[in-house]
Amino acid sequence: SCLHCADAPCVTVCPTGASYKRSEDGIVLVNEDACIGCGLCAWACPYGARELDPRQGVMKKCTLCVDRIYNEALPEEDREPACVRTCPTGARHFGDLSDPASPVSRLVAERGGYDLMPELGTRPTNKYLPPRKKGAAEAGPLMPLVDVQATGLAGWLDRILGRF
């Protein structure tokens, strides 16, 4: 999915200006009326976030559900991207990273969130969170080892290799 980079190479490489970054919020979008489907943006994106829609002949990408996040007809709790709203494990989060007091900013700070491939200089706005450390109580008990005797070809191979 698109990382909505601050320095988005997909925007600068687009020959028609169809790929653009909104000044008000930094969301990177594609104007499908101006897109010629050349694929330069897909080539330039180091994250593989672009794909060609062969039927329409234009490039497609994540829009951050811009139609949802600003839709005042929706209840406040529904104004988030569909991927965040429907993630079955709650692994995705959404919010204002420019506000250090926002829940998502606090989460990134507490968990040590980081940029994907920072050496590329694209400055992605999406952050990745490292896995949570699990305590012994959370991890659950270990299953007992089962003594399995290999049979057939695996048994023969075990016997042969056991000689060395």
Regions from the language model: what does each represent?
Residues 1-164:
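Non-ligating segments of multi-cofactor redox enzymes
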